[in-house]
Each structure stands twice: as C-alpha cells, then as structure tokens.
Amino acid sequence: MSQVVIKQQAGPLPIKQSFMWPSSESIIVAVSGSAWTQKPNTLLTLQVLVDDKVLGTIQQLAGAASTHLALPTGFFAINRQISQAVLTLAAGNDTTVTDLNDQFTVALIF
C-alpha cells in the first residue's frame, strides 16, 4: 500500500504536513523535489523530518548557479506508532534555495 502525504506542493521550504501515521509496521518514506543555489559548485541539501527529528537527508551537487535541479529521490525507513504525525521538508543548509518553481512530493510505502 502507499499513501501520498505531500503531492507536488510548490516551495519555498520549509513545508509542513500533519497527517495520521497509517501503520505501526516499518514504512518507507519516499521524497522527491528540486532546489537551486545562487553559488556554483554548491551542495544542495534537503532534510526530511518526522515530528521534528531528522529522518534523512538528500543531497545533490549543483555545478551551475541559478538552475533548478531535480534532487535524487530519497527513501528512508522508519518504525513509528499509529498516531498524529508532522512531516517537514526543510533546506539543510543556507545555500539551498527553493521557490514556487520547485515542487515536492512525499509518499509512504507500507
């Protein structure tokens, strides 16, 4: 089964979404999105948090400045009890930039 909790939501980051966590079994959190930077040869970093705890980080080297880049899709495993949850996508450093031209999707696979 799968459940989309953020669907093609435009930036900027951070993006927060509250939802009911669907299972007490292990779940894979799949995250995709894009970002850009104002400086060439900079590491783009996207942090994925559940209940304000870092679940994982997605990184992509931006060779050119001012170009939106697709980030690699991140897959992160987590065990958690069924209850209300808050998922947050946030820039992982001060050189990662997002705006309304960047879109983010998060799906739970269980």
Predicted regions and their residues:
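Solvent-exposed, flexible loop/coil segments flanking beta-strands in beta-rich domains
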Residues: M1-E25
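Terminal beta-strand-rich extracellular "head" domains
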Residues: K7-Q9, A30-V106
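Extracellular and analogous surface-interaction loops
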Residues: K16-S26, F75-I82, I109-F110
